[in-house]
Amino acid sequence: MKYDVITIPPDIYRFYLSNFTDDDLYSLSNNLRLNLNFNELKSIRDYFVNKLNRAVFDLELYSFSQLWSEHCRHKVFRGIIVDDNGNVIVDDILKSYIAKATEKCNKPWIVSFLKDNAGIIEFDDKYSIAVKVETHNHPSAIDPFGGAATGIGGVIRDILGVWASPIACIDVLCFGPLNYPYESIPKGLKHPKYLFRGVVKGIGFYGNNMGIPTVAGAICFDEGYVGNVVVYAGCIGILPTSTYRFSAKPRDKIVLMGNSTGRDGIHGASFASSDLKEDSERIARSAVQIPDPVEEEKLRRAIIRIRDENLASGITDLGGGGLAVAVTEMAGRINGGARVFLDSVHLREDLLPWEIWISESQERMLLIVPE
């Protein structure tokens, strides 16, 4: 037997990986849209068969899919780069170059970098500036308006995720030439002019509805971006330096706040880590989240008040991977675990447990509050 179904309801699938061949693992990954490579699939099988000696639940497989995605783990940046002869050029670009440059500065005004939702530097004796930038390329290639809007929404929440108040947006946008011949566009891709108009509207829609201006950025056009648009969204915020804190401890409570949870954004992190193909829109359209800046404005006001009244011991946003990633990261920061009651999550529609767990519905934040 390769799997069985536990009917609670809803239906929960268990997979007996000891009965799975290598080809079966590939089929499982494709059918569930896990986007895991063979080494990752094999390590999961070995762990559950040899160490835990039990079946793996569908929710656990989807958790690995999100937590081990390129979007969340930065496997390319953290990997070993070799030349044509197999000689190591660099081990972990993120650590060796990106992080090392800031570590080398070793300045006292660096409050936080590469360990929280946004980087923070001191502005003066009382306030600090928080900055976050992030790409939202794949979602924007499928739905330029929604992809760009949720890209801006995501970095605004990252700023809120370090207790800062967002004050300005920035962006870098890269498209193919606007006069690129229509007949030369590869199947499954959209024309640069359509992408350009949708992305610009999406960014303006989200920022304007929250009263946050886009104050700087850049735009470029090159044939190299016909195959994959670049939407590099950023946000800047300000916070009293003394309010930047993380004091969570075991037995604190997790609170999910903001928008209701729906089916939009499911597989978003793993989709962002895969290649764009001819059928990407048909398969992954639901991976693009639905933007709601009015709801995020409510979040902003609530979070700043929670900060000022010192009501929470920790905060993070729900971005790539949804609850699966946010809860895991928060629990990891205190070297602990968490018990999550999925039936308490406020839903927009009926969802399976694994869908609730990895949904990337926007305008949601996770708080940790003292018991």
Please place each PLM-identified region on the residue numbering.
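Core nucleic-acid recognition elements
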Residues: 1-277, 281-295, 303-310, 319-323, ...
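Short, surface-exposed beta-edge/turn micro-motifs
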Residues: 252, 362-365
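Short catalytic-loop micro-motif centered on adjacent basic/acidic residues
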Residues: 313-316, 366
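A short, contiguous, amphipathic alpha-helix enriched in charged residues
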Residues: 331-343
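Short amphipathic beta-strand starts and helix->beta connectors
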Residues: 342-354
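Short, flexible, solvent-exposed loop/turn segments with mixed acidic/basic and small polar residues
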Residues: 352-363
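Repeat-solenoid scaffold signature
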Residues: 365-371
